[in-house]
Amino acid sequence: MPRFESKGLCDQLRRAVVSIPSNIAEGAGRSSTLEFSHFLDIAKGSCNEIDTQILIAKNIGYIDEGYYNTLLHKIQHVSSQLYKLIKTVRTE
């Protein structure tokens, strides 16, 4: 991405990426499954945010279709794993 985006889209993307494991860790340290589930939902929301941000990056020409598809596949995999974890935690 262009250097001038280091404070824009890149920064937003970086925060969303860091948010996923951070929220999982914070939720795991909470005292109830309800709280854990809440933080997993936040992490899942960050996956959706990343999905949107990489689409924007592709649409404005910062990344090509191939790299977009690679990133999309990875974030969809993370999102799917989180969804399964959320279902498991909520049935406990």
How should each PLM-predicted stretch be described?
Residues 1-92:
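Amphipathic alpha-helical assembly/interaction segments
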